[in-house]
């Protein structure tokens, strides 16, 4: 029986980077991890209309840097940066960190961001758009924006049927077993009249590694397939 691997975790340190970067002593690790979870949850809920793609957190001693990637950064920044200043103070209270720096960057192509695409599909499902139409629209938009491949999946009581099921659509290539493949993965949930629907999106943007790094990775992949 085949085993599923998380697309992001599978490529950490190769084509994907860590969302949290810090070191903590064993006795403080759990507290620090829960602080990161609280920060992300707060930002995603407070700025839901901004289209939050990711929240990157770096810590060094008593300093913390939070980088927010958003489709509509103006909502997070606020008038003359007022909202960012508020967010700084809130994060300090949530974590007891002395110095917090918040940076907000714009997602240039939301159509190629798996999390934003998944959330857009979820929003359409909540507005009673059919799942096939929502998924096909997302696929068309991603391919027009330059995606090499895209796969979308919806699971749950689709259309209000008694038994839960999964439906998916795919266009282009999706090399899930290739480590050098730059595959963005995102999920979302849609609250419908018949219950919760889960949405998953994979977007293949091409290969990232070149030259010697690619040769080394190819040898590693060959060894993995032969063992």
UniProtKB/Swiss-Prot annotation:
GO terms for biological process: translation. The keyword RNA-binding applies. One of its GO terms (molecular function) is rRNA binding. Disulfide bonds: none annotated. PROSITE patterns: KH_TYPE_2, RIBOSOMAL_S3. It comes from the Bacteria. GO terms for cellular component: cytosolic small ribosomal subunit. Residues 39-108 form the KH type-2 domain. Pfam families: KH_2 (PF07650), Ribosomal_S3_C (PF00189). Part of the 30S ribosomal subunit. Forms a tight complex with proteins S10 and S14. Belongs to the universal ribosomal protein uS3 family. This is Small ribosomal subunit protein uS3. It comes from Sulfurihydrogenibium sp. (strain YO3AOP1). The lineage of its organism: Bacteria, Pseudomonadati, Aquificota, Aquificia, Aquificales. The gene is rpsC.
